[in-house]
């Protein structure tokens, strides 16, 4: 038989699952153990003890055995003797009962009477108890074994225990009691002035962008509050980060269904039904457990008797055990009914962390549903502290704090200094790409002037940005940045340039329209939708000091607000990504414009409204599908125009009126289809930069020598066969790009270009280089772009001088 100490195995599940067992499951498990003990004890007795003890009955009346024999009287019926083959003599009194049966006959009679005459309930009582108990245990533990539920439960318990023991949980919960209040020393010096400014930041954002007064809350505008976090070591931080990812994936997976809830409900219903079934038939049949049993069997031919009186030795004990078993089943059933009532009364497929949100600083802990909610309800019956500690890993605020700590551990001050570079404007720049946030050490780079944030989700700009007193330029590329009120107050006074690139309107922080001192704004993204234009563009009216506006989008027409801010704009740049831009008459109002860029706007012709902008100094009409530029005659009214860019178009010829642009200093006509250069072009005597590369030119006119101020000439990728001698009269030439033409030779007069620093000759038909290249004192080997075999045709002393010039520069 099974030892009693091993019975617990049938009721115990994995030790880790104990936290999923409410008090009622614990009670029913122990009741099941007692039931098992009853079954094992009864079964053991039944196997080891005599099941039935039978004796033949000599005095039988109507197949019933009389307890004693009395003499026959006149009034007494005459007894019969079916069990005896020899009738007793009436006048001989009995002095005792003697049976002529041996031991084997008695054993046979016991077995036959036990099998045929003992009631089935008394016979199988221990086995019924064992069967019902095993069914109860199976119902209680099936959800721990069924693959579709056990996997979820195992995963849940594993994550829950790790969250409970995580150092991050303890630190996060401790912040709800004690908040760190010591600000950084460098920032504390500015608190006196910054606090006053930040107190009105939220109101100013709403005031400057009227549409926000109705639709945007303080949080939606990206203005948030912040508290300092503790410190974890790197290993603990990485472990906590992994836990956050596991919790996210587990929540997504478990909230999809409610199979755990439904299976637990069905288990409970089955146990309740089983309870009623057991009570009904057990109470009904328990009285059939009797000590005395009359047994009438047709075995007279084997034993000589037909009727026997039998004793069931275990009847009294079985009756006691049955009564005890019934009481246990009643207690078990009441618990199951309470469980069912608990499940039906409460909404167990929803779990709210409302109380935890009120007690802690993590007000963003979400409510959960379905199986996730049900398992948390079960955990609360075991110990509510588990849910409280687990909730920390459901909070995005908590995750952001942890992410910030890990980020600070990874990005030390020395590592950030190694990432500092000088940009084209010679400003000290830091580019952070695809990080989880902004490392706090960034704000210790006091020399920083330009900060680029790209693909950084949910970044929050802290007050410590005020330490960067030299910061004047901020880039937000696909970065939906929030900002704290003190930080916004600082940027309002100090930020001068802002670059924003977005694909979704939500990536544009609305607080940018409160930057009163902003002078330069670059917006790159889709503004074709009407609501996008309204939200993004409309706020520009409040940027009164804006001088430079760059829009890279796909507008169909110039928004009215651009015209409104254009009164004080000095530079307007629109890159329309190939979408046709129409209705440009409003440009006339931008009287203060000095630079205008209309790139990829599919204009086809030069807009007439440009000619009214008398302060224009630079015009860029790149890639606009221009085929003719006859309107260029009107440019003569733009007396301040010094730079004209008509590159990347389909221009076939240059109008002779180009000569009227006498103040022109830079002219870009590259990437067109020009075949001839008019003489009038060389009347622009102030030209310093002329780019005619990638056209269809076959020669350069001799009048090019009139451009005495020319410093850079580019005619790369044409079909020029020879260079006019007059070209070398342009003594100020510093760069000469002649690559990919069909030049047969390079004139020796090239040595007269004493200011030449770069000459490109690659891709021509030259056989040798003139020795006079050595007479260009500023020319170096790196500035001579030519095939290596062609370079080898120069005399050794010339090559040596060119190489030496490179080394001296290095």
Swiss-Prot record:
UniProt activity-regulation remark: Inhibited by (4-[(2-butyl-6,7-dichloro-2-cyclopentyl-2,3-dihydro-1-oxo-1H-inden-5-yl)oxy]butanoic acid), which plugs the channel like a cork in a bottle by binding in the extracellular selectivity filter and sterically occluding ion conduction. Lipids may block conduction in closed heterohexameric channels.
PTM comment, free text: N-glycosylated.
Residues of the site described as Required for anion selectivity: 103
Cited SUPFAM superfamilies: L domain-like (SSF52058)
Keywords, sorted A to Z: Acetylation, Cell membrane, Differentiation, Disulfide bond, Glycoprotein, Ion channel, Ion transport, Leucine-rich repeat, Lysosome, Membrane, Phosphoprotein, Repeat, Spermatogenesis, Transmembrane, Transmembrane helix, Transport
Entry membrane topology: Multi-pass membrane protein
Topological domain ranges for the Extracellular compartment: 48-123, 287-316
Protein family according to the UniProt entry: Belongs to the LRRC8 family.
Protein name in the entry: Volume-regulated anion channel subunit LRRC8A
Organism in which the protein naturally occurs: Rattus norvegicus (Rat)
Source species taxonomy: Eukaryota, Metazoa, Chordata, Craniata, Vertebrata
């Amino acid at each position: 038989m099974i030892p009693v100490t091993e019975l617990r195995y049938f009721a115990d599940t994995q030790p880790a699952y104990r936290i999923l067992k409410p008090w009622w499951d614990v009670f029913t498990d122990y009741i099941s153990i007692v039931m098992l003990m009853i079954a094992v004890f009864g079964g053991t007795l039944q196997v080891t003890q005599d099941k039935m003890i039978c004796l033949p009955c000599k005095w039988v009346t109507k197949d019933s055995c009389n307890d004693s024999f009395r003499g026959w009287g006149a009034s007494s019926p005459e007894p019969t003797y079916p069990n005896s083959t020899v009738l007793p003599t009436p006048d001989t009194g009995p002095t005792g009962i003697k049976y002529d049966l041996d031991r084997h006959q008695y054993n046979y009679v016991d077995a036959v009477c036990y099998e045929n005459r003992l009631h089935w309930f008394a016979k199988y009582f221990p086995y019924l108890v064992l069967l019902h108990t095993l069914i109860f245990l199976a119902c209680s533990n099936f959800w721990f074994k069924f693959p579709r539920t056990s996997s979820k439960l195992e995963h849940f318990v594993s994550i829950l225990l790790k969250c409970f023991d995580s150092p991050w949980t303890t630190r996060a919960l401790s912040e709800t009691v004690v908040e760190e209040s010591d600000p950084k020393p460098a920032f504390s010096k500015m608190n006196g002035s910054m606090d006053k400014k930040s107190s009105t930041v939220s109101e100013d954002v709403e005031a400057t962008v009227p549409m926000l007064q109705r639709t945007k809350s303080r949080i939606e505008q990206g203005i948030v509050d912040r508290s300092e976090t503790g410190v974890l070591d790197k290993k603990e931080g990485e472990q906590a980060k992994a836990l956050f990812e596991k919790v996210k994936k587990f929540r997504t997976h478990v909230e999809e269904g409610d199979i755990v809830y439904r299976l637990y409900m069905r288990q409970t219903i089955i146990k309740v039904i089983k309870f009623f079934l057991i009570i009904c038939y057990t109470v009904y049949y328990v009285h059939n457990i009797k000590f005395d049993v009359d047994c009438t069997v047709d075995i007279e031919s084997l034993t000589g008797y037909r009727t026997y009186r039998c004793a069931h030795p275990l009847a009294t004990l079985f009756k006691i055990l049955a009564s005890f078993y019934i009481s246990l089943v009643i207690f078990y059933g009441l618990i199951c009914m309470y469980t069912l009532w608990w499940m039906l009364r409460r909404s167990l497929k929803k779990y709210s962390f409302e109380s935890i949100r009120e007690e802690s600083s993590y007000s963003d802990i979400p409510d959960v549903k379905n199986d996730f909610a049900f398992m948390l309800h079960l955990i609360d019956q075991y110990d509510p502290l588990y849910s409280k500690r687990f909730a920390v890993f459901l909070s995005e605020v908590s995750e952001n704090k942890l992410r910030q700590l890990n980020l600070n551990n990874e990005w030390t001050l020395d590592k950030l200094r190694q990432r500092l570079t000088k940009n084209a404007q010679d400003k000290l720049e830091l580019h952070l790409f695809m990080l989880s946030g902004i490392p706090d050490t960034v704000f210790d780079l006091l020399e920083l002037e330009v900060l680029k944030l790209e693909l950084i989700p949910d970044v929050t700009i802290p007050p410590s940005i005020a330490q960067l007193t030299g910061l004047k330029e901020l880039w937000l590329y696909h970065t939906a940045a929030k900002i704290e009120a003190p930080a916004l107050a600082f940027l309002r006074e100090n930020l001068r340039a802002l670059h924003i690139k977005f694909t979704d309107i939500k990536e544009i922080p609305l607080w940018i329209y409160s930057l009163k001192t902003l002078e330069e704004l670059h917006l790159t993204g889709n503004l074709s939708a009407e609501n996008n234009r309204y939200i993004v563009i409309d706020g520009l009216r409040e940027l009164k000091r804006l001088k430079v506006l760059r829009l890279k989008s796909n507008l169909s027409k110039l928004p009215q607000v651009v015209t409104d801010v254009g009164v004080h704009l000095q530079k307007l740049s629109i890159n329309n990504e190939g979408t046709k831009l129409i209705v440009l008459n409003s440009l006339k109002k931008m009287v203060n414009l000095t630079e205008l860029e209309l790139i990829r706007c599919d204009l086809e012709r030069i807009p007439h409204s440009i000619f009214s902008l008398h302060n224009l100094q630079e015009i860029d009409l790149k890639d606009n599908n221009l085929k003719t530029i006859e309107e260029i005659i009107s440019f003569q009214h733009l007396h301040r125009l010094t730079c004209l860019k008509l590159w990347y178009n389909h221009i076939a010829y240059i109008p002779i009126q180009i000569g009227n642009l006498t103040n022109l200093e830079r002219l870009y006509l590259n990437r067109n289809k020009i075949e001839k250069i008019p003489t009038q072009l060389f009347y622009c005597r102030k030209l310093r930069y002329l780019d005619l590369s990638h056209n269809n030119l076959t020669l350069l006119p001799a009048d090019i020598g009139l451009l005495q101020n020319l410093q850079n000439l580019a005619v790369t990728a044409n079909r020029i066969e020879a260079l006019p001698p007059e070209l070398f009269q342009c003594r100020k030439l510093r760069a000469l790009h002649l690559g990919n033409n069909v030049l047969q030779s390079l004139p020796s007069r090239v040595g007269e270009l004493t200011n030449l620093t770069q000459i490109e000759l690659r891709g021509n038909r030259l056989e040798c280089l003139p020795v006079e290249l050595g007479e260009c004192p500023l020319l170096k080997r790196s500035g001579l772009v030519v095939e290596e075999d062609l370079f080898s045709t120069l005399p050794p002393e010339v090559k040596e001088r060119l190489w030496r010039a490179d080394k001296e520069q290095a």
